[in-house]
Amino acid sequence: MQIITEPQTIQQACLRWRADGVHTALVPTMGYYHAGHESLMAHARAVSEKVIVSLFVNPAQFGPGEDFAAYPRDLERDAAMAEAQGVDVLFAPKAEDLYKKDHATWVEVPALSQTMCGLSRPTHFRGVCTVVTKLLMLTMPRIAVFGQKDWQQVAVIRRMVRDLNIPVDIVGRPIVREPDGLAMSSRNIYLTAEERLQAPHIHHGLALGRAITQSGERDAETIKTAIRRYWAQNLPGGEEDYLTIVDPVSLEPVDRLTGATLCATAVRVGQARLLDNMMLLGD
């Protein structure tokens, strides 16, 4: 596996591959890998001739007071895990090489970015869209693979590449969970032992919502009330950032469930802000 840090170097390599008709896949990451990341790399490896993994803790998607400085970093560990998954290139640029001092251009998808996570992180998706656009322009992959734990991120990026006519297929892959149901996340490292015991109840609450839906309930507020009641009893240390039931494509909230419907949440447990989601109706 090759480790590349210079943007122009990765772009030159990818231009050669594209000229030769090589099918490439990009897996954008912020590092500190776990089995969820490994599943994304494994999928990319299975469907592509060359796999590029980007490792970049993107300062532009963190707001004031967020965990940019604390976000876990271990390049040596991550490189070993990526190599074990058959990754061809690990692209690990420096922030100053992606964002020049006079950087003035941003990419936004306001229609999908101002709800859910965007309510408490108003500049987050501007940073995400800008860095993903940069990575796509540098690597020119046929596909880019993202985890569905951040469902909103996948929806935003899909709309972005559609609207900007970027020739890449955005692939969303299922959430990978711990045996007790907790969605795998690099931020799980922030949890204390007691918080780690409580955190799986985020998932269990969503599963209760799905069970209620499957029993015939179609009123969104009734379902959310049941989830919140469950959390109040089983997740006393949790602080809800948002809990919403939406159309999985448009992310528009729904009052009554009639077709494919997603329940998504962000919950703060101690120092960790944890995302999870679950389809209530549809695949």
From Swiss-Prot:
Pathway: Cofactor biosynthesis; (R)-pantothenate biosynthesis; (R)-pantothenate from (R)-pantoate and beta-alanine: step 1/1. Belongs to the pantothenate synthetase family. The gene is panC. Its EC number is 6.3.2.1. The active site is at H37 (proton donor). (R)-pantoate binds at Q61, Q153. Homodimer. GO terms for biological process: pantothenate biosynthetic process. Its main location: cytoplasm. Catalyzes the condensation of pantoate with beta-alanine in an ATP-dependent reaction via a pantoyl-adenylate intermediate. NCBIfam families: panC. It comes from Nitratidesulfovibrio vulgaris (strain ATCC 29579 / DSM 644 / CCUG 34227 / NCIMB 8303 / VKM B-1760 / Hildenborough). CDD domains: PanC (cd00560). It is found in: Cytoplasm. It comes from the Bacteria. The keyword Nuclease does not apply. It catalyses: (R)-pantoate + beta-alanine + ATP = (R)-pantothenate + AMP + diphosphate + H(+). The lineage of its organism: Bacteria, Pseudomonadati, Thermodesulfobacteriota, Desulfovibrionia, Desulfovibrionales. This is Pantothenate synthetase. GO terms for cellular component: cytosol. One of its GO terms (molecular function) is pantoate-beta-alanine ligase activity. SUPFAM superfamilies: Nucleotidylyl transferase (SSF52374). Beta-alanine binds at Q61.
